[in-house]
Every structure is written in C-alpha cells, then in structure tokens.
Amino acid sequence: EKKLNFIIENKIIYVADNIGYLYAINYLDKKIVWAKNYKKPFRSNLKITQDDLLVADQDNLLYFINKYNGNKKKNFPTEEVILKNNFYNSLANDDNNIFFLNTFGSLYSIILKDKKIQWFVNLNQSLDLSTNSLFYSNPIIINKNKIIVSSNPYLYILEKNSGLTKVKFLIDSIIKPISSGQKVFLVTKDQLLVCIDEDSGKVDFSIDINQETSNFLGTKNKKTLKAKMISIVNDELYLFLKNSYVIKVNMGGKIQQIDKLPAKLGTFPIFINNSIVYLNNKNRLIILD
C-alpha cells in the first residue's frame, strides 16, 4: 500500500512516499516542480528550513534535500532497526535545530547552520537495546524550550538545549499529543482526554470522551468512539475521531460543538488561515474553508 507524507510551504506541496519518491507540486497550477527517486522507502514526516527539505528513510538515514530542485545536500546515518513496527521516524524543528527521533528510540538535536550533532539521548526502555528491540512513540513536539515525547509507556518532557529529562510520567497516548504552551493534551487507550502540566507533570483534568459526548448529545447509551488526532486552533481543542466526526472542546475539558467531515482523514490536518487541508484515506487532497 502506497503511503504519502506531505508538507506545504507557500503554494508548494512537498511529498515523500514509502517507495522512495520525493516530489514538489505547485497545487495552484497543479504542476510538478520537480520529482526524484531515492530508491529507499521514506519513513518519516517532512520538515522545511530556509533552503532545505528534511526527511528520513526506513534505515533511519536523515536527508537534507535542496527544496528548490530535490537534490541531496547531506545525510546523517543513525542506528538501524531490523524489525519494524508502526512507528515512523519523527522530525521537528525550531529556527536553529532539527530534532530527529528514530525508530531505535534515539533523539538527536542537529544544528541547522553547520549540520552537526549538538546532543543525543536514547529513550528506549527495552532491556534489549539492540537492532532487534522495538520502540514506539508518537511524533515529537517542540514547545519553546521543551521537547515532548509520548512513547510507550512514558511521557517525556526534555530540555531542548541539553536533552535532559524534566518530566517522566507513566502514561501513553494512542495519538500524537498537543501542547498549548503550558499544558499537554493526550488521549489514552481508554479514550480519556488528559491534560498534564508541562512544568510539574501533574494531571489537571481527565475526562471520558465517550461519556462526555453522550452527555452533550443527550443520549442515554454511552457512545463508543475512537480518537484519531487532536489539534489546537484559537485556544480550543479539535478532537478528530475515526468515524469522521470532530469534537470541539474548550481548554477546561468541556465539549462545545460536534461536526462531521466530508471525507475520512488519511493524514494529520493542516490549518492554513481559515482552511483545513488534509489527504483522505484515498490519498486525495481535501481543502475545507
């Protein structure tokens, strides 16, 4: 099955797939800007810096790509993993660094200017730290001077400049958490929406999504819902469900609104101005105004 990851900058969509193709498309003109075949399946999200497109392959090799022509500028080899699970390499960046969490469980901070490693730390809790050990995490989050990593079974909050652990909390999330700046929001396997203070690691609130949805709709039977993704827009939480519904929740954990999307989510939605952009489960681009 073909799997796509994409990122948008200005009017260009950059796409990487699990076959090894990397390409740029002008979505306004609907024309291909460039296309390259790197012949290794890509296995990460994409990030953009001033001149570079960053992506990692299935062997945990991190690429710096010229975003204007698709040519490789530099790569970073990291630990390979023989066995694969559902975890993809995760990239995040700020103005000065790219942060790379690979499928071995190692988190790297790489300085963008000179493309050198600033620090790295391994978060794999397996007793067998070998290329056969499996590590799972949600995509990493950068929040000011912190890095948030939601792995199985721990939530880590680390100092961005040093990699030192500030918070280590025994909780795992079935989706990528989201940070408001002071709080991190996640969803557990029991469909609990949990809010955790990023400085203290204490739980601010925990609500049962199924029960609260039933209460909001005024139904007696408890709903059986499954969360897919979560976002923050205009200081409100948007909880996207696998059944194509979206629940809008305020920062105190109260449901405000429930709506239905016209097509199922295939990728994490991107919010651009007043529009929501995502790929559906058939890899078709959906733009909602």
Q: Where are each of the predicted segments found?
A:
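Extracytoplasmic beta-rich repeat domains
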Residues: 1-8, 31-50, 72-95, 116-144, ...
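Fold-core signature of tandem repeat domains
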Residues: 13, 22-25, 53-54, 65, ...
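Structural signature of WD-repeat beta-propellers
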Residues: 17-18, 50, 57-58, 102-103, ...
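WD40 beta-propeller blade core
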Residues: 23, 63, 108, 117, ...
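Short loop/turn segments that connect beta-strands within beta-propeller blades
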Residues: 26-30, 66-70, 111-115, 159-162, ...
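Extended non-catalytic domains of envelope/secretory-pathway proteins
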Residues: 98, 139-150, 157, 236
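C-terminal closing repeat unit and adjoining cap/tail of repeat-based domains
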Residues: 162, 236, 241-289
